Swiss-Prot record:
Protein purpose: Probably involved in the biogenesis of the ribosome.
Name assigned to this protein: Probable Brix domain-containing ribosomal biogenesis protein
Nucleus in keyword set: no
One of the protein's GO biological processes: rRNA processing
Protein keywords: Ribosome biogenesis
GO molecular function: rRNA binding
InterPro entries named in the record: Brix (IPR007109), Brix_dom_Rbsml_bgen_prot (IPR023548)
Domain annotation Brix: ranges: 1-164
Amino acid sequence: MIITTSRKPSQRTRSLVNDLARVFNFKILNRGKIPLSELIENKDDMIIVEELKGNPGRLKIFNFENNKILSMNLSLKLQREVSGKAFKNSGKLGSKFDKNTEHLKEFFFEYLFKKLSNYKEENFEVVITFKTVDESTFYIEVHKGSENMGPSLKIKTVKILDIE
């Protein structure tokens, strides 16, 4: 899976892309002047980190099998802000949803987890946790054992969009 940014990303957006690439073992595409239409034509599964007011503000996960996009508005803390270090996941990755985020499990499996070669339903070393803040907000965090490794994403809205 490829991860990239909107054009002319800020340093904070590039840092988030690097953090996510290290955790999920994504390939980073330095977008440069590549138009979005060209990225979509390739039909490679991808994630685009978009900016709002100069900061990473939206994550779009493209699913070309269903011709849909999982779009999430977010705020975040980078790995260096959460754990003080850059964490590279070289092991198996799993997920854990609390009772209030359980309904999101199928979306994240369909759009993200089933496309990862290192994702396992059990016997994993690193866990992506989904936990509720309130009825409209939840966190996605990366844990190894009991330690939060970062990044920590606070998701405010989740929408399913059509790829046009």
